[in-house]
Amino acid sequence: MRWGGGSSALGDAVARPRDDRQRDLLRPALEEIIDLGHPLVRLAREIDWGFLDQRFAGVCTPGPGQPGLPTRLVAGLFMLKHMHNLSDEVLCARWLENPYYQFFCGELSFCHRLPFDRSSLTHWRQRLGEEQLVALIQESLSVAHKTDALTTRDLERVVVDTTVQPKAIAHPTDARLCHRALEKLVDLARRHDVPLRQSYRRIAKRAAIMVGRYTHAHQFKRARRALKFLRIRLGRVIRDIRRKIAGNEALQERFASLLALAVRVRLQDHRQRGHKIYALHAPEVECIGKGKARAPYEFGCKVSVITPATKPKGGQFVLHAKALHGNPFDGHTLAPVIAGLEALTGVETRRIHVDKGYRGHNHAQKFRVWISGQVRRVTAPIRREMRRRAAVEPVIGHIKAEHRMGRNYLKGRDGDRTNAALAAAGYNFSLLLRWLKRLLHSLIRALLVDPASRQNA
C-alpha cells in the first residue's frame, strides 16, 4: 500500500542521477560477506527505492552534464545519519568501514574510498529541501504498513503536540552579542582593507568579561555601566565603517547585512518586546518559553509532531513533523498540520487528541478534536484514547536525544524544516530496524521449538 502523493519543485539544475554501479570482478560481492538476515539488509529490501528516485528526480533537469549521485546512495546516507545520530564526518568514516552501511546504500562490492565528497551531503540537503525529504517519512510509513508494524486504523486517531527544535547557538546575552558584532565588523573591515580609526578589540573583550562578572556578583549598576561602555564602542565602529565605505557601492553591499544586524544588536534591550537578534549567524532564531523549570526559554523554532493515539505493533511512529516559524500559537497550527498529514498519508483523520495549549484551535471539524481534560461528549473509548495523549512526549524526547532534533546545526529556516523532516524519518526507520529484528527473533524461536512440544501446546 502506498500512502499519499506529493508534488516536487525544481531546485538547482543538476543532471538526473544515474545508478550505473557495477560489481568489481576482482573483489567479493557484499552479499557474499554479510549476514543477509541483518536488520539493515532486510530494511533495504523492504524500501521502495524507485519511489524515492521518482520523488527526488523533481530537483533534476534532463540534459547534458555530470549526473548526480544515485538516489539510493543519497537517501541511504540521510537515513543512516539520523537513525544513528551521526555527524557528516562520522557518517563518512562509518560508511567506509561498515559493509552493511554500504549495502544499504546500494553498493555491490566493498568500497575502500568514498564515492562522493563529504560536502555533497550539504549540497543535496539544500537541493532537496523539506518538500522532497518528506518522502522519507512517507516511505517509512509505507514500509511499516507492509511489515504489519502499522495499520490504517492507526492513522485515523492521532495525537498532536509541539516542541522546540533548539538551534546550535550560544546562550544569548547583550554583552556577548555586542562583543561578537564588534569582532565581526572589525574582521570584515580588515579583510576588505577598510582602515579603522580604532578597533577596540582588546577593551571590548575586557568589557564583555566584566559584564558577566559584575552580574554574577549581583553588582548590576556596574554591569550596566560596562554594557553601556561596550555599546558605545560598537556604535563608534559602526559609524567609522559607514564613513569609510560611503560612495563605494561594492563595499556598501558587502557590509549591509552585518551592519544592519549590528545596529539592531546595539539598540535592542532585554526588556524589549517582539523579535530580537539572538545569534548573528542565525538571525531567524526565536525565543520560545514552554514553561519548563530546567529551561524556561529555548532558542530555535517550534516543531509540530503527530503520532498515533493507538498502540501500533511496531511502536509509536511519527506520522508528520513540520517546523513552524514565527512562534505561532499552538491552536493556530492545528488545521495546517492535519491537512499536511492527510495529504501525506491519504487517510482521513477522525479523532485528534491535543493538550490544553490548543484551546481555541482553528480546525474546521471542531467535534473531531479532543482536548486534554475535556468532559463533554467523552465516552469510554474516547477516554481511553485521551489517556494515550501523553504517549507523544517520550517520542519527542527520543527524537531530540537520539535523532538530531535536540540541536539543529543546519543553516537558516530551510535548515530548520529539513532537519525536522530528517529527524522524524530517522526515528521511524530506527523503529523499523527494531521491528524487523523482533520479527527475525520470533521466526527463529518458532523454528527452534520442538515439534512434539508444539503439538502438546
Per-region residue spans from a language model:
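Short, conserved catalytic/metal-binding motifs centered on acidic residues
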Residues: 38, 75-77, 88-92, 117-121, ...
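Flexible, glycine/threonine-enriched loop-and-boundary segments that flank and lead into catalytic domains
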Residues: 277-298
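Electropositive, glycine- and tryptophan-enriched low-complexity nucleic-acid-binding patches
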Residues: 292-344
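Charged, often Cys/His-bearing segments associated with DNA-binding zinc-finger transcription factors
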Residues: 1-50, 54-57, 434-457
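Helix-centered, glycine/charged polyanion-binding patches within enzymatic domains
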Residues: 342, 346-418, 457
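Active-site- or DNA-interface-adjacent structural scaffold in DNA-acting proteins
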Residues: 108-284, 363
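Basic, low-complexity intrinsically disordered segments
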Residues: 11-15, 53-149
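Flexible loop/turn segments at secondary-structure boundaries
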Residues: 286-289, 312-314, 327-329, 358-362, ...
